[in-house]
Design a protein with these regions (language model features):
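Enriched for short, Lys/Arg-rich terminal
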Residues: 1-3, 57, 61-126
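N-terminal "first-domain core" detector
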Residues: 2-15, 26, 45
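A short, surface-exposed loop/turn module that caps and links secondary-structure elements
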Residues: 32-59
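Surface-exposed alpha-helical segments enriched in charged/polar residues
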Residues: 14-17, 32
Length: 126
């Protein structure tokens, strides 16, 4: 079996560093297991229905913590780690796109507008 290409974002490392040591160890174990076989049933690679971006999934670290992953072609990018609900809330606000000019993956917050944007009363000059 080929090893999956797994990348780790700086935000993932920062989020992991803020978790208890015991959880950090579990994250390391999971990353190694994920690299060897991302389709392993023990990883619980699952779609997050609340996400705007359908390429974002969760992986189970333990009963309490989840990792957030985006799959772009044959590369998995680990984005975030947090308590289950907080991780899902974080993921629901994100979108990932490949920059057409640089080829790099960009992760950004999605904002929703609660009111329609008013039409301009005067025509625009340009």
């Amino acid at each position: 079996m080929t090893t999956a290409k797994v990348a780790i974002s700086a935000d993932f490392l920062t989020a992991c560093a803020h978790r208890p040591r015991q959880v950090q160890g579990k994250v390391t174990e999971l990353v190694n297991k994920f690299r060897n076989d991302p389709a392993s049933p023990g990883i619980h690679y699952e779609k997050i229905n609340s996400c705007i971006d359908k390429k974002i999934y969760s992986i189970r670290i333990d009963d309490t913590y989840r990792g957030i992953v985006v799959r772009q072609s044959e590369v998995y990018l680990l984005l975030w780690v947090d308590h289950h609900d907080e991780a899902y809330q974080w993921a629901a606000r994100k979108r990932c796109e490949v920059n057409p000019n640089t080829g790099s993956l960009q992760v950004f917050d999605v904002q929703t507008v609660s009111e329609p944007i008013a039409a301009h009363s005067q025509p625009l000059l340009f």
